[in-house]
Amino acid sequence: MEAWKSGLTRRDWLGGAAATAGVLVIPGQASARRIAASDRVNVAVIGAGGMGANNMAKLTSQNIVALADVDLAHVAEAFVDSKGAPKPEMQPLKTAYDRAAKFSDYRRMFDSRKDIDAVVIATPDHHHAVAAKAAMERGIHVYVQKPLTYTVREGRTLLELARRNPKLVTQMGNQGHSGDDGRRVVELIRGGAIGRVREVHAWTNRPLWPQGEARPAAVAKPASLDWDVWLGPAAVDWGYHPDYAHFNWRGWVPFGIGSLGDMGAHLVDFPVWALEPGSPTRVETRHSRWGGDDNIWDGRPPADLGSYPLANITTYQFGNAKGGPLTMTWYDGGLMPPTPPAMPTTARMNPDGGVLYMGDRGMLMHDTYGQKPVLIGDGVEARAAAVPVSLPRIQDGRDGHEMNWIRAIRGEEAISSPFSVAVPLNETMLLGMVSMRADQPIEYDGASGRITNVAEANRFLDREYRKGWAL
């Protein structure tokens, strides 16, 4: 992908990131850790439950030297069944867990452990950038779960850090980017199997967590939970409630990015990769009511933002797309695009999630993570058969995303989803949330990183940080 936006090469865009990251001054940083191909990598994990445990399970061949989690008792519950008996399949992970140094605060971990080569960051969204920046400034390679950052400014800040230290190996946790099916989708779209694509639809069944709800009253927190560290950079403290932690934080404005942030990296990834549309030039969102709001449809966000709307439709216009103007529409909360008249009855849009590309010579549809691509239209199969394999395949596909990062750290292969790829993708997703919070369509200049038609909406490209947790 040589030209990420019209008139600008990717190098131009990367080089300009510092100028568009606000007034942030990035201090000097340590050189990236060098690891021999024969060595095991010293890995730390921040957020060792949930996705962090899944990531760690893929990395037990390495040295898991440190873990940081705000509720280590909760993490330990994953190793036993409902009766307290050990789960045999979890024992390799438990062995790694038992050997690792443990912290509740990753800032203390970074200060005290000088042997960390690489870190997995699998915290709630509002911690991602703060933890990643702290690691990168120490020369530590980073694997950051999706969505990469909570704000546009954070993404551009991390990209500038990566640009200044090109030996740092960075990876976003959108594992579908390493999958064989998704890579074939990109080849087919670029190879013209369905002709020129000017319309894309992407959808998900999320949320699977509280969203569109009023903020609950605080309750007593579990004794094992360090609530102050869980809040971290969040500028508000509503008090603990299980609707926030664990897992359920995704739908609450101070902590997560909603359904678009949670699943966009597994769906929007492929059209952005294949079509190289650059920055969206216009974004408009229609949605159900905000949590705590009484309006049913397109109600203005309440002053005290609680949870995101349960469902939304976000339309992106890419006026500078490489192949000509492109429209991409996102649906969540169970909403789906209308079935095209040309869609055969044998082709079914998966209600769990998928992407539909509408070309002038046919259509292509796939599930989440780029899986199970289906070609639709006369002559499409024949044209697809003629499209050569051009992208490298990752060992073990999407199940090998973590080890691709390790092998890249060792210098054995190219990284799959580095920040140079992940930041522009993440920015596209975030602009949908900005339009939602601005409560009106926004027009965006990707080169400057500014909203041009609604000046006050630019505040949503950044955020406030709690004292002691600033980026």
Q: Where would I find each of the regions flagged by the language model?
A:
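N-terminal glycine-/serine-/threonine-rich beta1-alpha1-beta2 phosphate-ribose binding loop
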Residues: E2-I140, R156-V169
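Non-transmembrane alpha-helical segments in soluble domains
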Residues: L14, M56, A76-F79, R107-F110, ...
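C-terminal helix-rich "cap/oligomerization" subdomain common to oxidoreductases
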Residues: G15-A36, S307, R407-L471
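Hydrophobic residues in well-ordered beta-strands that form the structural core
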Residues: V45, I121, V144, T151, ...
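Short, solvent-exposed loop/turn and secondary-structure capping segments
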Residues: N54-L59, E77-V80, V130-A134, R153-G155, ...
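Short, solvent-exposed turn/loop segments enriched in Gly/Ser/Thr/Pro and often Arg
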Residues: F103, A122-H127, L148-Y150, G155, ...
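A contiguous active-site-proximal alpha/beta segment in oxidoreductase catalytic domains
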Residues: H141, T149-S224, V229
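Glycine-rich, aromatic-lined ligand/substrate-binding cores of catalytic
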Residues: A223-M403, R407, E413, E427-M433, ...
